[in-house]
């Protein structure tokens, strides 16, 4: 069982530079076809300063850390014990190439199902750009067996 006293635990902020290459690779990998993710001219024509990141692009930010699964170790969860159950983003401003994103996360909730056989961890993250503008918030739910 995961210690409920860990609810509210925060993690050190992490910074990620959004580049044209990262956007193009992610857009290609996720089957995007809109040219605003590939061609600067198309993005600018639509009013963006540079390539626009696809909506789920921010998922990749946490995986750029030196140890992206450190939070699992902190909670004594082995990699094979959990599944990603849900992810929800709320966007406030576009994320574009040239942005520097700061990600701040915390464990916001922990609850059980099936008599405690399954534990659900809810992480909330805030993504802020170089201008200190909150561009998005996310809620990620993991299930641990």
What are these regions (language model features)?
Residues 1-84:
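Hot-dog-fold acyl-thioester-processing enzymes
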Residues 84-90:
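A beta-strand/beta-hairpin structural motif
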Residues 1-2, 6, 91-145:
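HotDog/MaoC-like acyl-thioester-processing domains
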């Amino acid at each position: 069982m995961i210690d409920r006293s860990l609810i509210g635990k925060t993690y050190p902020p992490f910074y990620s530079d959004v580049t044209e290459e990262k956007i193009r690779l992610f857009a290609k990998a996720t089957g995007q076809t809109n040219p605003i993710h590939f061609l600067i001219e198309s993005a600018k024509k639509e009013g963006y300063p540079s390539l626009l990141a696809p909506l789920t692009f921010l998922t990749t930010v946490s995986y750029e850390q030196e140890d992206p699964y450190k939070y699992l170790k902190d909670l004594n969860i082995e990699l094979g014990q959990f599944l990603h159950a849900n992810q929800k983003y709320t966007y406030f401003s576009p994320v574009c190439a040239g942005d520097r994103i700061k990600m701040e996360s915390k464990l916001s909730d922990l609850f059980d199902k099936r008599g405690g056989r399954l534990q659900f961890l809810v992480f909330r993250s805030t993504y802020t750009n170089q201008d200190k503008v909150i561009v998005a918030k996310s809620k990620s739910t993991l299930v641990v067996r």
